Amino acid sequence: MSQARGFDRTITVFSPEGRLYQVEYAFKAFNNAGITSVGVTGKNCACVISQKKVPDKLIDASTVKHVFPITKGIGCVMTGSIADARAQVSRARSEAAEFEYKNGYPMPCDVLAKRMANIAQVSTQRAAMRPLGVAMTLVAVDDEIGPSLFKLDPAGFYIGYKATSAGPKQTETINWLEKRFKKDGIPSNLTDTVETGIQALMSSLSTDFKSTELQIGVVEDDKPFRVLSVEEIEAHLQSIAEKD
């Protein structure tokens, strides 16, 4: 840590090894939250899934949220600091609303991802600012490119995926998804897409979930983004159990 001394106090200065320590700390911050999320695209749909942990029995579970709508057709899952997550979601909604007001049509998912990544990158080079300790995974079904899935990180990097994960178990989850996609290809419908995501989390975390321990957002062709109810999640869990 002696090598980091002096260079981890500001995000605008590279260390002699070419590292930005505050940006690296931001990556650790969203992993330290202990929540793993996953995003999966299907042939005409996409979904995002997050663990849902309620640390205290007195907390109202309905107020613990990791999945958020951005616009009618775009949603996201936020992994990491929930305070930073709400700030980034609020900014994304503002950017999308301003884009639609100026251009007369909804902001495409890839354009929103690029805009939010550019905003995040600015936080890595200016003084008196810090990177957000959160990873943002956006989903939509675009009129031109179809199902879209983009992940943004605290460094301002973004890229599109067929399926991806964020959080402490993202490596294990992504490895499972790679094997699944290589074997079975892209899920053919919404049910398969959602259950693929759930099974990926189950495998990487080595646990069976209750319906109250997951939060799932889905978007389909010509249908708005929505968050599944506890009953709908339970139906998917029952379907997975019957297959096993």
Swiss-Prot record:
Gene3D superfamilies xrefs: Glutamine Phosphoribosylpyrophosphate, subunit 1, domain 1
Matches recorded under CDD domains: proteasome_alpha_type_6
Localization, UniProt: Cytoplasm; Nucleus
Pfam families, alphabetized: Proteasome, Proteasome_A_N
GO biological process: proteasome-mediated ubiquitin-dependent protein catabolic process
Keywords noted in UniProt: Cytoplasm, Nucleus, Proteasome
PROSITE patterns found in the cross-reference section: PROTEASOME_ALPHA_1, PROTEASOME_ALPHA_2
InterPro entries cross-referenced by the UniProt entry: Ntn_hydrolases_N, Proteasome_alpha, Proteasome_alpha-type, Proteasome_asu_N, Proteasome_sua/b, Proteasome_subunit_alpha6
GO cellular component, one term: nucleus
Broad class of where this protein is predominantly found: cytoplasm
Annotated SMART domains: Proteasome_A_N
Known partners and oligomeric status: The 26S proteasome consists of a 20S proteasome core and two 19S regulatory subunits. The 20S proteasome core is composed of 28 subunits that are arranged in four stacked rings, resulting in a barrel-shaped structure. The two end rings are each formed by seven alpha subunits, and the two central rings are each formed by seven beta subunits. The catalytic chamber with the active sites is on the inside of the barrel.
Family under the similarity heading: Belongs to the peptidase T1A family.
Record's function text: The proteasome is a multicatalytic proteinase complex which is characterized by its ability to cleave peptides with Arg, Phe, Tyr, Leu, and Glu adjacent to the leaving group at neutral or slightly basic pH. The proteasome has an ATP-dependent proteolytic activity.
Protein name: Probable proteasome subunit alpha type-1
Source organism of the structure: Schizosaccharomyces pombe (strain 972 / ATCC 24843) (Fission yeast)
